[in-house]
């Protein structure tokens, strides 16, 4: 079996896994699903399939979603730009955590929190900016 390339196939696997977890009494809040991010350099629909899968997981199972966000840009130039855009879309779709470069994308995450109304008076965004500026100054 190859890597799943459609949201429907992934959904089928997730339903099987979810049912198995429930049969063992594992609550949804203790489950973290990783939808396997593939590079858009090899499949232009890979990012979109992942975003659809994230939405499906949050809607149907209510579990946490983890993803290797930087996989999406593998083999492409200006990976950081692609990663930033994808991370914003993934968080909007419902991703709860990401495996990524914490220094390069931490300010992006803070900006997303700010724009989603989760950072009163931009306090965390400004603090992160200052912390990163201090690191660069060393």
Each language-model region and where it sits:
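Catalytic alpha/beta core domains of metabolic enzymes, predominantly
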Residues: 1-136
């Amino acid at each position: 079996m190859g890597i799943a390339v459609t949201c429907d196939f992934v959904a089928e696997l997730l339903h099987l896994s979810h049912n198995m977890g429930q049969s063992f009494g594992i609550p949804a809040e203790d489950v973290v699903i990783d939808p396997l991010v593939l590079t858009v350099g090899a499949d232009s629909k890979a990012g979109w399939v992942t975003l659809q899968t994230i939405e499906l997981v949050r809607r149907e199972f209510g579990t946490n979603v983890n993803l290797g966000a930087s996989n999406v840009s593998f083999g492409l130039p200006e990976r950081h730009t692609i990663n930033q855009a994808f991370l914003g879309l993934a968080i909007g779709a419902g991703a709860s955590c990401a495996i990524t470069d914490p220094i390069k994308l931490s300010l992006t995450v803070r900006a997303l929190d700010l724009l989603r109304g989760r950072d009163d008076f931009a306090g965390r965004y400004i603090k992160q900016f200052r912390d990163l500026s201090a690191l660069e100054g060393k």
